Amino acid sequence: MTKEQAESFLHTAESIHALSCKTPKQREENCREGIKSCAPDALLQVIKTVMERREERARQGKKLTLLDLHFIEQAEDILYEELAISLSISRVEVEEKIKAYAS
């Protein structure tokens, strides 16, 4: 990914929505496919999906499942490292930029 592609992706991050899944099995399959694709849009969808699930489970007084933790860690590692390299900034700065643009 070039620097220009990375900057363009950050500016479109807000318009990328979480995956819409009817069943837990479907969510799991969609997350696996998104991570396997390594496409920035798909990775951000996985991250947003798991973040929504984290909020939902917190409202129920539950923790995030290990599988969901695994999905978000993988997606964040791939996406944040790719953007950090492309933009020549640290991973922490990438996380801050994603949060600023995606919210």
Provide a role label for each language-model segment.
Residues 1-103:
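Charge/polar-rich, low-complexity and marginally structured segments
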